């Protein structure tokens, strides 16, 4: 089966992960939808990680170079994924981080710099480790019953948007966190105090917030970008009674 798909930033390739006969050993494939093929035929897929008995996974598509992916491959240690930089056009793999620290995830800023790593212990507690040079500094921690995730960076890459329900919070809330000072600045939570924070949409060109959203019986958007709001309202008028969403 397939395990999700991505478009590259330039729309040149569709990327997807796939195993063989349900064995859960995943490879990453690329297909060019614009490739010229005979009528009734499909473009040929390329296996970018032609290794046996591995579970490769895509962590991020590059925001600066559409020919680059950040992926994880557990070829060295089956329990943990090392971080690689993959060049789509050539299949070249470059090791970015050898995972000997129980790292379960990686987060990159707007310039594709590795900034935060997620480390999980045997009890299910998770630490956010801030990367400064070769040093990894713990900056945030959640227990197994709490949630926290990074949902992008601010305009100058100095702070990240954190969605969390740590501590006495009943519902997930959006904050802006400074990884150096560890200071949290409240941004937003559900005005009706009924549902978790739903989603944050950021403009990849301006790096500013487009909208936030919350989902109960339907999804409600709070717009900060007038142009996007106008586009949304136009589509709502075209499809009355339907829910409209943007995907990228």
Can you say where each PLM-predicted feature lies in the sequence?
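Peripheral, non-catalytic segments that deliver or gate enzyme domains
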Residues: 1-3, 9-248
């Amino acid at each position: 089966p397939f395990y999700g798909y991505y478009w590259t930033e330039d729309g040149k390739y569709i990327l997807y992960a796939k195993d063989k006969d349900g064995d859960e050993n995943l490879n990453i494939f690329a297909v060019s939808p614009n490739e010229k093929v005979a009528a009734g035929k499909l473009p040929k897929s390329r296996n970018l990680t032609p290794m046996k008995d591995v579970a490769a996974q895509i962590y991020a598509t590059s925001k600066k170079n559409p020919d680059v992916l950040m992926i994880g491959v557990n070829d060295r240690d089956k329990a943990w994924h090392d971080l690689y930089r993959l060049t789509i056009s050539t299949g070249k793999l470059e090791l970015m981080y050898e995972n000997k620290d129980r790292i379960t995830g990686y987060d990159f800023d707007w310039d594709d710099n590795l900034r935060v790593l997620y480390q999980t212990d045997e009890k299910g507690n998770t630490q956010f480790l801030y990367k400064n040079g070769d040093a990894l500094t713990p900056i945030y921690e959640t227990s197994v019953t709490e949630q926290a995730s990074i949902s992008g960076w601010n305009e100058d890459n100095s702070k990240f948007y954190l969605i969390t329900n740590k501590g006495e919070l009943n519902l997930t809330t959006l904050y802006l966190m400074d990884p150096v000072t560890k200071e949290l600045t409240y941004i937003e939570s559900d005005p009706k105090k009924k549902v978790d924070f739903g989603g944050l949409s950021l403009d990849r060109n301006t790096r500013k917030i487009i909208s936030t959203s919350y989902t109960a019986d339907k999804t409600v958007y709070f717009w900060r970008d007038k142009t996007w709001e106008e586009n949304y309202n136009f589509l709502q008028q075209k499809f009355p009674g339907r829910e409209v969403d943007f995907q990228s």
